Amino acid sequence: MPPFYIERGEQMRTLLLFDQVQAGFGGKERGDTELGLEKGGVGSYLMFKEDFETAGLTALATIYCGPDYFQAHKEEVIHKIKNLILKTKAEVLFAGPCFNYGTYAQMAAEIALAIQEQTDCKPYVICSKENEETIAAYKDKVVMLEMPKKGGVGLREALGGAVAIISGKKDESEQRFQ
């Protein structure tokens, strides 16, 4: 069921959810980075920007948060993200690429589940199979798509595939954790 966004000249409204590393605001040592927001796509978005544009997705904003900060302020972070989704009328929450960063994948899955339960926005978590515990806990609750670990082969294809799934051009079963 393709959404035909490009044919109608519309764009699918998307918010990106990154940790501080993927947003470009520091390394693992900055896990306490507070919830922040940048207009448009920043950081790792540049890896799949072309795929987004080709598929008719538009990055409204990049939400970023350190996993340690999230764990200490879950309710506040989820509440603010939910309100942003409602305000922007975002249709998709793109949480990733999480690679094999366990704390980021856990944060992404928890936020994705809350957003799925509290809004009409469709969340997608993109992470590597090394996040076994998070995948086992959330794969039947939210859409979790597979990608290689950091430094792994096939990153470009995995991110392009995730975008194709979101835009309706590819079936999610081809990349979803089973």
Language-model segments: residues:
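An N-terminal assembly and electron-transfer interface module characteristic of large anaerobic redox
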Residues: 2-178
